[in-house]
């Protein structure tokens, strides 16, 4: 599945890597969409941050950092047992994650 993505235009890919990864533009500023600069502090809607407790690709501490970066006070973190893929495909996740998302949305 890693290799199932479409080809990317070289310059667009370079710009994405430079702005999003190297410069951390959504945190530090510098990302422009259309004619508007955007960053995480501009988020004005409720945020539900779901992450896997045993994720080896996106460690929980990397996910938890979002709390201090978004501009919204309605912020919820939910962690689930599992790894990077297991949080989406395991039987337990299939029972727990969708219901949790439903409940969170229903409260808003």
Predicted regions, residues:
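Short beta-strand/loop motif that positions the catalytic acidic residue
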Residues: 43-44, 49-51, 55
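Short alpha-helix in the alpha/beta-hydrolase fold that links the catalytic acid
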Residues: 45, 59-69
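C-terminal alpha-helix
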Residues: 100-108
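Catalytic histidine-centered segment of alpha/beta-hydrolase-like enzymes
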Residues: 57-60, 77, 81-96
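Alpha/beta-hydrolase
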Residues: 1-39, 45
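Mg2+-dependent phosphoryl-transfer active-site scaffold
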Residues: 72
